[in-house]
Design a protein with these regions (language model features):
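Beta-sheet ligand-binding and adhesion/scaffold domains
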Residues: 101-185
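Tryptophan-anchored aromatic micro-motifs
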Residues: 31-64
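Bacterial N-terminal signal peptides
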Residues: 10-21
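Signal peptide processing junction and immediate N-terminal pro/mature segment
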Residues: 22-32
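N-terminal glycine/threonine-rich, aromatic-flanked beta-hairpin/loop signature
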Residues: 60-94
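Bacterial N-terminal signal peptides that target proteins for export
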Residues: 1-12
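Sequence contexts marking disulfide-bonded cysteines in secreted/extracellular proteins
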Residues: 52-54, 67-69, 93, 179-181
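Short, hydrophobic/aromatic-rich segments at coil-to-beta transitions
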Residues: 44-52, 75-81, 102
């Protein structure tokens, strides 16, 4: 009987540890989710690749929720694109970051702009959420592909406000280098 009583306290300890494992694992996952969904000051980030979106990480198959900015940061310089995940609606943005605002230039590709309607150089809000303001548009290049034409438009003035955006744990959208090739325009 003495031998069994020695195992009883050890069994209780093991049962307690095993029962607590799923709870502590779950709390770690919830804690990690909270950290990913906290607004972050972009200027304070180290050099690297990032993705910020206007809505928290959907935790499903989607690459992002709301409107997103996928970018590379080096010092106070950023190079990336701002747009809607799973769509062809995006604008390349590069510039200087100050707190949660990027000030610099924008680049877009537009299909089939009528010759009589060149881009307007006046300031306008690009997105429905009104985070990206563009102005001073210039046509850089027009390329004809079969019967369609693609026009590259440079916006000499771009201002992107990312206040309140959420940092995702890793970039999941298309890499910046595949969409924003500033030198080839």
């Amino acid at each position: 009987m003495l031998r069994i009583s020695n195992f009883l306290p050890m069994g209780v300890v093991c049962a307690t540890l095993l029962a607590g494992s799923p709870i502590s694992g779950k709390s770690l996952a919830v804690q990690a989710l909270r950290l990913t969904n906290q607004p972050v000051n972009i200027a304070s980030l180290g050099n690297g690749n990032y993705q910020f979106c206007s809505q928290p990480d959907p935790q499903d198959w989607r690459d992002g929720a709301g409107v997103c900015f996928n970018f590379t940061k080096t010092g106070n310089q950023v190079n990336g694109y701002y747009g809607y995940p799973h769509s062809d609606q995006f604008i390349c943005v590069r510039g200087i970051v100050d707190s949660d605002r990027i000030t610099g230039e924008g680049l877009s590709m537009v299909w089939d702009i009528p010759q009589k309607h060149p881009p307007d150089s006046a300031e306008f809000k690009w997105d429905a959420e009104e985070h990206l303001t563009l102005s001073q548009a210039n046509i850089l290049n027009t390329v004809n592909v079969d019967e369609d034409s693609a026009t590259w438009i440079l916006y000499r003035k771009a201002s992107l406000n990312l206040e309140g955006f959420y940092q995702y744990n890793r970039p999941r959208m298309t890499p910046v280098i595949q969409l924003c090739q500033w030198n080839s325009k």
